Amino acid sequence: MPAASDRETDVVLIGAGIMSATLGAFLKELEPSLTIQMLETLDDCAQESSDSWNNAGTGHAANCEMNYTPQRPDGSIDISKALQVNVEFDLSRQFWSYLIGRGAIADPRSFIHPVPHMSFVHGTENVEFLRKRFKAMSAHHCYEGMEHTEDPRKIAEWAPLVMDGRSGDEPVAATRIITGTDVDYGALTHLLVGHLVSQPGCAVHYNSCVTGLVREQGGRWRIEVRDTASGETRSVRAKFVFIGAGGGALPLLEKSGLPEARGYGGFPVSGIWLRCDDPEINKRHHAKVYGKAAVGSPPMSVPHLDTRVIGGKHSLLFGPYAGFSSKFLKHGSLLDLFESIRPANVKPLLSVARDNFDLTEYLVGQVLQSESHRLAALDEYFPKADPKDWRLQVAGQRVQIIKPDVKRGGLLEFGTELVGADDHSLVALLGASPGASTAAFIAISVLEKCFAGELTASAWLPKLKQIVPSYGVSLIDDADFCRQIRATTAEVLKVDNIPQPAARAPAAAKRA
């Protein structure tokens, strides 16, 4: 069948997940005249990593994730990375609050719930680490109100399942901060996409697989699309393309032929949770309890026992158990990894394989892990867990970045990176962590990278500051403004907030 006629649009968003939905919402707020098309291979939005059960749903603010606070050689704790992640989540909170304020999202309870964030450790060395971590973090206003205890009875109050049945033979410790959240990113994505396509000039096309990206003379992009249901092909021309396709971003970036993408590769990691839906068990646990990963293990191995609230129902999640699959997407192909190999990224791929043997060994061990081994890991956080109450839940795929490096040949990075054209007409989001929680930060980074000329006082800047009042201000440095922002967004989002110290209240009010 001949290709359908070409279509013209200002913006094409590839992938209907939380990243594309967030960027699309930002762009339409800043420039209502923009025409935007979203292209998704599957038959609905949020079916890959954004799906409710394909991620842990943690509102990642680096409250409880100890891998963000490494110990320096001198024994002190470095909280710089944690602070950065912490205030990046504030950007998302402000963005969501803005959308609720203008009626784009009716009820925050449809996607976000207050759930305390906890860190839990056992053993003398780990207890000492958590004590030092708490001292460093609680001294900063971003972690004001964090609690710490080494009393098993207090921990049992905070997280009964964690302590019930635990022997008192070794020391334990925990921190808690009540401002933590559980976020249903699947529900949020549906809300954002629904809001976007309700506006003039915006549309989402499902069952639309992007098969080619061609740069035309004049700087526009021609996006070749195949309808997976009918087999028909068509093309769309756009001034700007964002590839927010999760694990599928790398193959699409390679299709673009951009020299800036040369040498990049991907390392796919699969994941499995244990899931409990028994209401009698779940009502005894209301927290996200993160443990400390074993020495030398990768970031995705951090164990946690989480409250999840999805569709109004409470569940428990434990994991993750990592594994290896050559798929780049949960609905992808086992050939994804092999088809991503190019002459330019062979050296980086081989270098990463050489330098990360421990990671490979860890993943192989996870793949070969028996059910009894998985339950033994659960037992460390829920000593009285009964295997019959738990079932396996397959998580989404994560594709970590492999990038070329002059000295080592290639580097494996556990983060995200924007890679795109030098004229800023196309950009792809590569990587995975910390993921959906920082979607607003990533969207703003795209704006700064690709639409810098519009971020002026006479163009988009006033509106951007209306959407994100802290834009241009460091919440890490400005304690009063940070407290003010958090109090405001907590009220709108209906989540818990720690009241600011009475002596400091006038200063915050004055800033407002």
Swiss-Prot record:
Q: Does the keyword DNA damage apply?
A: no
GO MF terms held by the record: L-malate dehydrogenase (quinone) activity
Which keywords describe this protein according to UniProt?
FAD, Flavoprotein, Oxidoreductase, Tricarboxylic acid cycle
User: At the top level of its lineage, which domain of life is listed?
Assistant: Bacteria
In its keyword annotation, does this UniProt entry include Endoplasmic reticulum?
A: no
Q: Which GO terms describe its biological process?
A: tricarboxylic acid cycle
Q: What pathway is this protein said to act in by its record?
A: Carbohydrate metabolism; tricarboxylic acid cycle; oxaloacetate from (S)-malate (quinone route): step 1/1
Pfam families this protein is in? Mqo
E.C. number(s) listed in UniProt: 1.1.5.4
What GO cellular component entries does it have? cytoplasm
Record field: catalytic activity:
(S)-malate + a quinone = a quinol + oxaloacetate
What Gene3D superfamilies is this protein classified in? D-Amino Acid Oxidase, subunit A, domain 2, FAD/NAD(P)-binding domain
InterPro entries assigned:
FAD/NAD-bd_sf, MQO
Report the sequence similarity comment from the record: Belongs to the MQO family.
Tell me the NCBIfam families matching this sequence.
Answer: mal_quin_oxido, PRK05257.1-1, PRK05257.1-4, PRK05257.2-1, PRK05257.2-4, PRK05257.3-2, PRK13339.1
Under PANTHER family, the record lists: L-2-HYDROXYGLUTARATE DEHYDROGENASE, MITOCHONDRIAL (PTHR43104:SF2)
Specify the protein name.
Probable malate:quinone oxidoreductase
- The species is Bradyrhizobium diazoefficiens (strain JCM 10833 / BCRC 13528 / IAM 13628 / NBRC 14792 / USDA 110)
